């Protein structure tokens, strides 16, 4: 954690972000850093039952109040890995994903390990949890709409809608022939 006050944060830690925003930055990754002198909201840690100050990734104070409202950032906010210990061992993925979205995150990064097609059920459970949170009001639909619009604007700005359509099955088969070839599997075992 960082013990900076709000004034210190604005004078030091936030300066590179403010400059990036002034220069047209389109995406910012949030960090799982705690600022207990600035963020007062906390949860009870799953790990040791202590008071756990929300890290910036889960903090509406940081992502909405400071980043968007004070600094004027209109781009996409993506999390660092949601599997990192600062999140997974203290908050847990279900609550953390909801808190992050409500804080202002647009894209959740690495919510679970996906090492094979068998792991698809883990991703489905995460998606189902978020859908359920929207349906029961824990995440406002407007919050999802805001993120969707920001991500679509970014894709448009990057020209991703102008790219020719690809044959997904052929692309997957090609990737598997490269990634899954015997030579690469042998190298993987050595590493």
Residue spans for each PLM region:
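Phosphate/pyrophosphate-binding betaalpha-module
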Residues: 8, 12-27
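Glycine-enriched alpha-helix->loop->beta-strand junction motifs that scaffold or abut catalytic
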Residues: 24, 74, 104-106
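Preference for extracellular/luminal or secreted protein segments
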Residues: 59-60, 69-70, 88-191
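Hydrophobic faces of well-ordered beta-strands that scaffold small-molecule active sites
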Residues: 28-30, 75-80, 108-110, 151
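Short acidic, glycine-rich surface-loop motifs adjacent to enzyme active sites
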Residues: 21-54, 79-81
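Solvent-exposed loop/turn segments at secondary-structure junctions
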Residues: 34-37, 83-85, 114-117
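Glycine-rich tight-turn/loop motif centered on a GG-T
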Residues: 1-11, 39-57, 130-140, 176-177
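Alpha-helix-loop-beta-strand connector modules within alpha/beta enzyme cores
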Residues: 51-78
């Amino acid at each position: 954690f960082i013990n900076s006050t709000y004034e210190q944060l604005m004078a030091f830690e936030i300066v590179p972000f403010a400059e990036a925003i002034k220069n047209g930055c389109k995406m910012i990754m949030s960090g799982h850093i705690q600022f207990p002198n600035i963020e007062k909201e906390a949860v009870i840690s799953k790990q040791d039952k202590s008071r756990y100050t929300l890290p910036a990734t889960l903090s509406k104070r940081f992502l909405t109040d400071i980043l968007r409202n004070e600094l004027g950032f209109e781009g996409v906010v993506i999390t660092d890995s949601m599997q990192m210990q600062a999140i997974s061992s203290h908050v847990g993925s279900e609550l953390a994903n909801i808190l992050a979205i409500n804080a202002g995150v647009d894209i959740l990064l690495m919510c679970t390990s996906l090492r094979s097609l068998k792991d698809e059920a883990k991703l489905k459970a995460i998606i189902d949890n978020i859908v359920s949170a929207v349906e029961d009001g824990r995440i406002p639909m407007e919050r999802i709409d805001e993120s969707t619009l920001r991500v679509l604007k970014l894709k448009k700005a990057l020209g991703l809608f102008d790219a020719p359509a690809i044959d997904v099955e052929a692309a997957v088969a090609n990737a598997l022939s490269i990634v899954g070839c015997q030579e690469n599997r042998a190298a993987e075992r050595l590493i």
